[in-house]
């Protein structure tokens, strides 16, 4: 059951890594050309993307302990933003194995990826406006987290994927040994 989670997560990480080649080797990214905003060009607009100076906190669901983490942290690494990952406790052992291997590889700066297994009560009580929080799980828990005083007062970006369903429905013609079954 974990194969698609692990392989899918690694594939996602590689897909994002390939996007990195499109970025310049700079601590910022200039998006498109400057746009004239006034007659005669005396006032222009230009989008310049810079990384947040905070941390990304990712609170993940039980069903994709590897994929869920890797697809979220991949964009952090592209932006130079460190990540704190809080997987669901019940499947955190898979997340922990992958994080351990990433850290052992020394491919990231020390502290760029951190993991909290078990209770993380209060994890978002210290976030600030330069941080970001993502949550995957139940809508009720997500709403509770999104209404956290710090999230609201600091206007912390909060991204929630809630109550998603993943299923496979096999027809009566699918039997053990068929590709769909295996």
Language model features: what each stretch is:
Residues 101-106, 112, 130-132, 141-182:
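ALDH superfamily catalytic-core signature
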Residues 59, 79, 86-88, 116-118, ...:
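Generic beta-strand/beta-sheet core signal
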Residues 13, 95-98, 126-127, 145:
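Hydrophobic packing residues within well-ordered alpha-helices of enzyme cores
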Residues 1-42:
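Long amphipathic alpha-helix in the N-terminal Rossmann-like dinucleotide-binding domain
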Residues 56, 63, 117-125, 137-142:
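Beta-loop-alpha module in the N-terminal Rossmann-like domain of NAD(P)-dependent dehydrogenases
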Residues 25-106:
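Conserved small-residue-rich beta-alpha loop and adjacent elements
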Residues 45-46, 113-134:
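A structured beta-alpha segment of the ubiquitous adenosine-cofactor-binding alpha/beta core
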């Amino acid at each position: 059951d974990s194969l698609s989670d692990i392989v899918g997560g690694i594939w996602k990480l590689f897909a994002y890594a390939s996007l990195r080649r499109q970025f310049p080797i700079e601590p910022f990214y200039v998006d498109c050309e400057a746009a004239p905003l006034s007659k005669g060009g005396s006032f222009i607009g230009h989008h310049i993307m810079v990384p947040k100076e905070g941390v990304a906190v990712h609170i993940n669901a039980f069903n994709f302990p590897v994929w869920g983490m890797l697809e979220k942290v991949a964009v952090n690494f592209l932006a130079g933003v460190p990540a704190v990952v809080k997987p669901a406790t019940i499947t955190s052992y898979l997340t922990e194995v992958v994080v351990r291997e990433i850290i052992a590889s020394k491919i990231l700066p020390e502290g760029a990826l951190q993991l909290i297994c078990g209770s993380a009560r209060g994890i978002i009580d210290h976030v600030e406006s330069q941080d970001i929080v993502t949550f995957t799980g139940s809508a009720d828990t997500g709403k509770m987290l999104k209404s956290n005083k710090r999230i609201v007062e600091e206007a912390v970006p909060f991204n929630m994927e809630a109550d998603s369903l993943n299923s496979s429905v096999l027809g009566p013609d699918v039997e053990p040994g068929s590709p769909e079954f295996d």
